[in-house]
Amino acid sequence: ALTFLVTPIGCGIAGWRVEEIAPLFGAAAELANVTLPESFWKVLKMSDMDAVISRHSVRRYLDRKLPVNVLNSLRSEIANVNAEGNLHVQLVTDEPLAFSGVMAYGKFSGVKNYLVMAGRKSADLDERIGYYGERLVLLAQRLGLNSCWAGISYRKVFGTYSLEPDEKICCYIAIGYGETPGVQHKSKSVNDVSNASPQTPDWFRKGVESALLAPTAVNQQKFFLEFLGGEPLPQVRITRGVSLIGYTRMDMGIVKL
């Protein structure tokens, strides 16, 4: 009996491009006389914009292990993120306690894999956590996973992470295979969060529309994008609003991606 195991893999793994990987899988499938599901090709060919559109916050997860190739892709990008962003992000797997406490009761279930978003204390740490954390979230989406940012709905489990004396944890990000792909929540309009108009470039409006799809704390969307123009490179300014909930600096970093 021939078993042909296929798991979705991300873009750019080991220097391969999607258009190079896809024919290899197609040829292997033909030799094995199997038909790859449409969902496989959808994940394999997912672009950054596809990931932005399909990403929704998911809080309930299946009891399903992350494949080795998915873990390797995540760990590789975490290493890049830590180096570029001067962070100390850590991946924790097969650990069910962090999201099982009273803070997560009724909100999360089945979470066994998550990112500990940490770094050296500084004025811009939250913003960097947001920017690079969302980069990991979109990679997870392209790998066929789901995710959810968590500001307080978790507990720190001793022995699952390490911190230097001058570092702190800003938040966690749950990742895994969701029970559902999630749903799009109510959003503000382009005019609510920007100065987009018929006079501003189309790329700016599209950028604002993408920003409105980004996760923010309790969907508060307390940011404003302003097209300033300028040559040779046009400038865009982002400002954060006032929030009793907080996390606006982290939200701003997420939106910047």
Whereabouts are the PLM-identified features?
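Macrodomain-like recognition of ADP-ribose-binding/processing modules
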Residues: A1-K45
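Acidic, surface-exposed loops and disordered segments
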Residues: M46-L257
